[in-house]
Curated annotation (Swiss-Prot):
It comes from Clostridium perfringens (strain SM101 / Type A). The keyword Translocase does not apply. This is Small ribosomal subunit biogenesis GTPase RsgA. Gene3D superfamilies: Nucleic acid-binding proteins, P-loop containing nucleotide triphosphate hydrolases, Probable gtpase engc, domain 3. Monomer. Associates with 30S ribosomal subunit, binds 16S rRNA. GTP binds at residues 110-113, 161-169. Residues 61-218 form the CP-type G domain. Its cofactor is Zn(2+). InterPro entries: G_CP_dom (IPR030378), NA-bd_OB-fold (IPR012340), P-loop_NTPase (IPR027417), Ribosome_biogen_GTPase_RsgA (IPR004881), RsgA_GTPase_dom (IPR010914), RsgA_N (IPR031944). Keywords: Cytoplasm, GTP-binding, Hydrolase, Metal-binding, Nucleotide-binding, Ribosome biogenesis, RNA-binding, rRNA-binding, Zinc. One of its GO terms (biological process) is ribosomal small subunit biogenesis.
C-alpha cells in the first residue's frame, strides 16, 4: 500500500492512503541507513496485526530543512504591499532560495486594498518581468483565495515570507475552510488551528499545504558561487552567450548578462542584488 506522510510525531507517522489515514512506525533499517522519514515523503507501507509499518521511502524530489518537509513543489511567497512596505531585497532572497531548491514560486501580495491600481500594475510588471506570477490577495477578507486554491492542485505548497505579511492569517483561512468543507477534523492526527510546532500537510483540493512557514532562515551563502546565476531565471537566455565558459557575470569581460542589463533587458536592481549576493558568498567562503 502506498501513501504520503502528512504528519510525524514521537516516532509515529500518519500516512494518507486511499483507505484513509494509517498510523505507522518506521522499519529499523532506516535508522541504520541514517534515513529518517519526513513529512511529504511518499512511502510504501504494510499493515501487520493491525499496526502499520513503513517499508520503503520513495525517492525525494526535494528536501527542506526548515521546515523539515520532502517533495515540496511550490511556494507561495507572501509579502504585504503596505504596512510594512515591500522590501525587494528580501523578496529576492526568498525567490533565490526557491530557485535553488527547484521550487516553483508564486508571489502573493497581501493587503492589496492599501494600494492604487497603478501601484499594483507597476509591481505586477516588475515581478512578471523577472519570471514570476503575481497574485493580489487580502488574507483577512479572503480575496484571491480561489486563485490560490487552484494552484494548490497536485502540489505540495509551502508558505514563506517576512513576519507581518499575513502568512498565519492565510494559513488559518485555508485550515478553517477545509474544516468547514469536510465537516470534521481528523481526531487521529488532532489537526487544529496553526498552533503546532510539528510540520503537517493540510489536504486541500487534491494538493497539500505545509502548515509551518518555509525558509525561516534566509542565509544564501551556502550556495556555490558558480551555481548562483542559475537561481535567476532572467539570466537563462544569456548564460551561454558570454565569451567565457563559466562566466559568473561579475568582473568578466564581454558578458552577455551585463550587456542585457545595460540594454534594459534585465532589471538593474535584480542584477545589483545578484552581485551583492555573489560577493557575500565569496567573502563568506573565501573563494
Amino acid at each position: 500500500m502506498e501513501g504520503i506522510i502528512i504528519k510525524g510525531i514521537g516516532g509515529f507517522y500518519y500516512i494518507k492512503t486511499d483507505e484513509g489515514i494509517i498510523e505507522c512506525k518506521a522499519r529499523g533499517k532506516f535508522r541504520y541507513n541514517s534515513l529518517k522519514p519526513m513529512v511529504g515523503d511518499r512511502v510504501t507501507i504494510k499493515v501487520e496485526n493491525g499496526k502499520g509499518v513503513i517499508e520503503d521511502i520513495h525517492e525525494r524530489s526535494s528536501e527542506l530543512i526548515r521546515p523539515t518537509v520532502a517533495n515540496v513543489t511550490q511556494a507561495f511567497v507572501v509579502f504585504a504591499i503596505k504596512n510594512p512596505d515591500i522590501n525587494l531585497d528580501l523578496l529576492n532572497r526568498f525567490l533565490t532560495l526557491c530557485e535553488y531548491n527547484d521550487i516553483h514560486a508564486v508571489v502573493c501580495l497581501n493587503k492589496e486594498d492599501l494600494c492604487t491600481e497603478e501601484e499594483k500594475e507597476n509591481l505586477k510588471e516588475l515581478i512578471n518581468d523577472i519570471g514570476y506570477e503575481v497574485l493580489f490577495i487580502n488574507a483577512k477578507e479572503g480575496k484571491g483565495f480561489d486563485a490560490l486554491k487552484e494552484r494548490l492542485e497536485h502540489n505540495i505548497t509551502v508558505l514563506c515570507g517576512p513576519s507581518g505579511a499575513g502568512k498565519s492569517t492565510l494559513l488559518n483561512a485555508f485550515i478553517d475552510r477545509e474544516h468547514m468543507e469536510t465537516g470534521s477534523v481528523s481526531e487521529k492526527i488532532g489537526r487544529g488551528k496553526h498552533t503546532t510546532r510539528h510540520s503537517e500537510l493540510i489536504d486541500v483540493d487534491n494538493g497539500y499545504l505545509v502548515d509551518t512557514p518555509g525558509f525561516t532562515t534566509l542565509d544564501v551563502t551556502f550556495i556555490d558561487r558558480d551555481s548562483l546565476k542559475y537561481c535567476f531565471p532572467e539570466f537563462n537566455d544569456y548564460n551561454n552567450l558570454c565569451k567565457f565558459n563559466g562566466c559568473n557575470h561579475y568582473k568578466e569581460p564581454k558578458c552577455a548578462v551585463k550587456e542585457a542589463v545595460e540594454e534594459g533587458k534585465i532589471n538593474k536592481l535584480r542584477y545589483e542584488f545578484y552581485i551583492k549576493t555573489l560577493e557575500e558568498i565569496i567573502n563568506r567562503r573565501g573563494n
